[in-house]
Amino acid sequence: MRQGFVKVAAVTPKIVVADTRENTKLICEEIRKAEESGAKIIVLPELAITGYTCSDLFLQEKMLREAKQSLLEIAAFTFALDCIVFVGLPLEYNGKLYNVAAALNNGKVLGFVPKTYLPNYNEFYEARHFTRGMDEVVIVRLDKDLTAPMGKKLLFVCDTMPELKIGVELCEDLWTPEPPAIRHALNGANVIVNLSASDETTGKDIYRRELVKGQSARLLCGYVYASAGDGESTQDVVYSAHNMIAENGRLLAQSERFQNESIFSEIDILKLNAERRRMTTFEMAEDGYREISFSLKIEETKLTRYIDPMPFVPGSKADRDRRCEEILMIQAMGLKKRLEHTHCKSAVIGISGGLDSTLALLVTVKAFDILGMDHKNIKAVTMPGFGTTDRTYDNAVSMIRCLGADFMEVSIKDAVNIHFRDIGQDPKVHDVTYENGQARERTQILMDIANKSGGMVIGTGDLSELALGWATYNGDHMSMYAVNASVPKTLVRHLVQFYADTCGDGKLEKVLLDVLDTPVSPELLPPEDGKIAQKTEDLVGPYELHDFYLYHMLRLGYSPAKIYRLAKIAFAGSYDDATILKWLKTFYRRFFTQQFKRSCLPDGPKVGSVAVSPRGDLRMPSDASSRIWMEELENLQ
């Protein structure tokens, strides 16, 4: 449970219809196995103690008495276990019968949540036996000295982890226009458990899965769905034990249907709370809910859920291609509008032969195509300097010609040498002045060409560079419209790859593939034996690590310790722990110290959920202290 991870289980025992004593044994055994597997929240199906398909046997006093006795035995069984259990049973109160979920912890019955919506259509006729749950909280007497609250407005709150609040709904409740989980969530519940007995018909599993995913997304919550399965009566229908665990729209685990399979995963409570803090329209309510405390030990939770090392990049090729097509269109449409608004006659781009300028050129070409403008109005400028290699130069020239842009070449060597002479910079001293002088000279050239041609300078820098401040202030940092400003480096590669795969031009494809194969470099230092000597990832670290850090820090608000923990899992076998920690420290240090560059970024389109525009997603003071983050990093090993 440390760092917000809570292991949950959805469990379907093979019950015997109406045999409460046998079911008690089966349920206790499943609870034991789930708890030994580390589950802290264990959810069993609707009416699991008796079986959902008892039908008119629910009206038998003997059945109800035995069900209550079974509940007390199961509750006692939890005394030595570190978990909270939710199990279904029929419960009589004031002469009425209710279909309820019982919450059990530390040997006690914490409370009962009755089902709100009773299906009474098609194969369902629950209203024949049960009464709709009451709004007010009442007290149910279970034994001479034992009582427990019952009502729809109950939430179960962990006293050792107050961030964890659990709400309950039962089967049909999920399928209605206004599920109880909505009010639960608005009153603080961030985990919803659903005790279900959903029969199987053709195609129903697809709809059910979308309901669970959609509910968890809409309510920014974890959702644990446990359904009845083999063991229920098949007199008229079949139950498939379709169990699911979802978190904010993502399916974390799902059982094979017809297998009575227990499933496990970890729900990230702190992530859900961070999402709710961010979404200010998720307005909390006060509907008179009663919160009931339970206790769990705070222990390290072994993570079994998949940790994606590339959070910005979809895993499947089909999804990746759709994402790339969409992003290219967003970028192009953003630029199209800016060109129309400013009545610019041309676009000016510095082309280095690297990934970022390549993507910016491709986006500009797409925008011009949308506008019906001639590619010759794209002034693609290559500006060889002291670090330019033949490979990047040749790729830049070939690419420009393949795309039909107006090729321009302006060497910066003479101008930079004159500038160095004017300011007293020794050209043999390859320091920050040596590097930044070249970057600023290139920006000056582009700005002047734009003025001369009535054009607009298109920025090429990407999100990853901006996060690290890997840009020369008022050099490549500056433009008139920055099309790549919210595209992370790991995604830039896939966008260029997608364009290469779909352009239909063999020569252009070959050039783009070689650009992809070229080391990332600003080429501001002289080459060695004609090859790139200055490799960005050797200096600031691998971009795949930095993009991982950026996503989890900025998008989810995770602490350094939590990011480090997840990165070790995500990049196991690729980077050792020391390397991950080294570059994580670099990331935090640079992220804070370089905010002044992000505070004056030019306009550019947002394409994803993470961006650093000072007018949009990141409003951060340039002089904020990084002390508390760096101290946490220093304590990590």
Regions found by a protein language model. Give the residues of each.
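Enzyme catalytic cores with a strong preference for nitrogen-chemistry domains
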Residues: M1-G350, K366-K376
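ATP/NTP-dependent adenylation/nucleotidyl-transfer catalytic domains that generate, transfer
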Residues: K7, N23, T160-L164, C221, ...
